Amino acid sequence: DIYVYCAEIPTAETRENLLEKYCSIAEFGNHYWESEDNTVMNNGVPVDIIYREVDRFGRYIDTVIKGGKAFNGYTTAFWHNIKNSKVLFDKTGTFTKFRDMAQIDFPENLRSAIIKNNRNLLNGKLPSYDRQIKKAQERGDIVSVNHRITAFLESYFDVIFALNRQTHPG
């Protein structure tokens, strides 16, 4: 994967005009998860190019890393991505500044929030995943069982990484 952090995401048409000569197969402007171009380069190497607005990560740092906001799984995945990015080009230094801000120890308030939020989702509460899985199983809804097990694992791994003060690799 190649992540392109920019002030404004270029249009799919602009990206296609720039990249098409380097690709044997390409889909420009996919938005299944993020704004991305999915390609196979002329040398046969598959490359996914994901475009992100850099200001979004300033808000993420403020909300999650500094503010201690937990999500239902994958809480620190963007932090992990920022922290471990290899900067190839940064004309303004904006992304490098965010990456440098991400080089901190795991904040205790975030660790506690992740554990509390996701632990409550695992079991012991009325809407906990264990109860959702059991209800889906009782009604014979195997698709829902699978869906809730996946959500359970997302929260479970969020807790494991937080307990160990490690960012989630996504």
Q: Model-predicted segments: where are they?
A:
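Solenoid-repeat scaffolds in large eukaryotic assemblies
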Residues: 144-145
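Short, charged amphipathic alpha-helical segments flanked by flexible coils
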Residues: 165-170
